[in-house]
C-alpha cells in the first residue's frame, strides 16, 4: 500500500520538524485537479521540495539552494504529520495573527492569499494545524518523475513496516495543546 506525501519547501519541512512551525498554508498548485487544493489527507509524510526561491520567502531558517530533484536521486523523508484541523480563511487579519506559528514572510502569504486559481477565489487561503512526528530513522527511496509537478499531494512507495513504532513528536503534548488552543482562538476570531 502506498503512502501519501505532502510536498512542502525543504526549509518549511525543517521548521515543522524542529517545532518552529505548526501551521501549513496552501493555495494550490497548477496541477491540483479540477476542484483545486484541499486538505484531503489528515495524515501524511512531509516530502521536501527544492524548487522556488525559498530563502527570500521565509523569515528564518537555513536555506541551502539546491537544484530540483533528479530521477534516481535519494529522497529522505524525516517527518510524518497529522492535521489537527484544516480551514479556509477569508480574513487577512486572521492569517496575519498566525505569524508566531510559521516562518513564511507576510509578502509570500499575501501573494498566496490574493491569488485566484483552480477552486479558490482571491482573498482566501487554506491553513491546517499539524502535529509533526520525527521518524527514528529517515525513510529513503529514489526520486521518481511522478513526484514532480505543481501539486501538493503525491503517492509515495510503501513505507518501512516499522515506521509507526518509531515516531517521536517534535513538540510535547502540553506545548502542542497550548498551540492548538491559541491557533483555534485565532481561527474562530476570539483573540
Please place each PLM-identified region on the residue numbering.
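Structured alpha/beta reader/binder surfaces that contact nucleic acids or chromatin modification marks
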Residues: 2-191
Amino acid at each position: 500500500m502506498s503512502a501519501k506525501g505532502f510536498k512542502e519547501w525543504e526549509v518549511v519541512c525543517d521548521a515543522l520538524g524542529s517545532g518552529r512551525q505548526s501551521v501549513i498554508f496552501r493555495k494550490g498548485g497548477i496541477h491540483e485537479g479540477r476542484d483545486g487544493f484541499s486538505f484531503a489527507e489528515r495524515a501524511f509524510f512531509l516530502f521536501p521540495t527544492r524548487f522556488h526561491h525559498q530563502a527570500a520567502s521565509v523569515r528564518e531558517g537555513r536555506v541551502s539552494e539546491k537544484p530540483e530533484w533528479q530521477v534516481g536521486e535519494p529522497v529522505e523523508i524525516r517527518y510524518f504529520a497529522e492535521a489537527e484541523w484544516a480551514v479556509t480563511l477569508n480574513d487577512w487579519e486572521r492569517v496575519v495573527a498566525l505569524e508566531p506559528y510559521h516562518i513564511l514572510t507576510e509578502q509570500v502569504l499575501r501573494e498566496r492569499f490574493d491569488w485566484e486559481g483552480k477552486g479558490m477565489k482571491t482573498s482566501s487561503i487554506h491553513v491546517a494545524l499539524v502535529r509533526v512526528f520525527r521518524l527514528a530513522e529517515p525513510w529513503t527511496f529514489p526520486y521518481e518523475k511522478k513526484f514532480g509537478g505543481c501539486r501538493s499531494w503525491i503517492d509515495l512507495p510503501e513505507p518501512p513496516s516499522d515506521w509507526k513504532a518509531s515516531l517521536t513528536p517534535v513538540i510535547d503534548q502540553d506545548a502542542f495543546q497550548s498551540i492548538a488552543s491559541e491557533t483555534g482562538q485565532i481561527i474562530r476570531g476570539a483573540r
